[in-house]
């Protein structure tokens, strides 16, 4: 079971179906406002008014999705002024391109974690985020970046606050804590 809400107010959303030649087919959700935001005027603005160009760009801007192997991934924002800007000798990747990489190439949580560990992550649009990743075996983790270190937490639920132990734990909105508590209560009360 993997669920995610898409509660952006007044946004244009797109469901993207992908069938890469070398990788897993997937469905993903894209907030199209992220693609067209801050484009301005001129050639780029005119190009992004084309449905074909927006659809092509959407392929590389997923916020969540599931692939044919049963891997599901979602990005959740955390209300924090910190940003993810890893800086090692690994190749750079942004939040949304990381999701596309995982959907295309990872068939399990372990494979997803191995892939993420090969890159320096940079938060798209400077936002602090964490990932919910689950697979067909029922394994479910949160991947958080605290002080630019990747931390993996085994958890069946993720909302919009840090789960990792340490000084950041719990930072996020009160509403995200309420949703987390409600979901955990429901899960614990549901027979398996």
Residue ranges and their predicted role:
Residues 109-120, 192:
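Short, well-structured alpha-helical segments that form the helix of a local strand-helix-strand
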Residues 1-59, 64-65, 69, 74-104, ...:
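C-terminal, well-structured catalytic/ligand-binding subdomain of enzymes
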């Amino acid at each position: 079971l993997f669920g995610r809400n898409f509660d952006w107010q007044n946004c244009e959303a797109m469901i993207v179906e992908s069938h890469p030649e070398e990788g897993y087919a997937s469905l993903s959700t894209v907030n199209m406002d992220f693609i067209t935001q801050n484009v301005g005027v001129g050639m780029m603005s005119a190009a992004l008014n084309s449905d074909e160009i927006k659809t092509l760009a959407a392929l590389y801007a997923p916020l969540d999705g599931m692939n044919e192997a049963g891997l599901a991934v979602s990005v959740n924002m955390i209300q924090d002024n910190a940003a993810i800007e890893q800086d090692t000798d690994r190749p750079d990747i942004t939040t949304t391109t990381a999701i596309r990489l995982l959907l295309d190439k990872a068939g399990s949580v372990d494979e997803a974690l191995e892939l993420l560990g090969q890159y320096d992550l940079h938060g798209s649009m400077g936002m602090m985020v964490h990932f919910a990743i689950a697979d067909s075996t029922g394994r479910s983790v949160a991947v958080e970046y605290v002080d630019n270190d990747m931390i993996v937490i085994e958890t069946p639920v993720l909302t919009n606050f840090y789960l990792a132990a340490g000084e950041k734990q719990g930072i996020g909105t009160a509403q995200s804590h309420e949703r987390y508590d409600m979901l955990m209560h429901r899960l614990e009360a549901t027979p398996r």
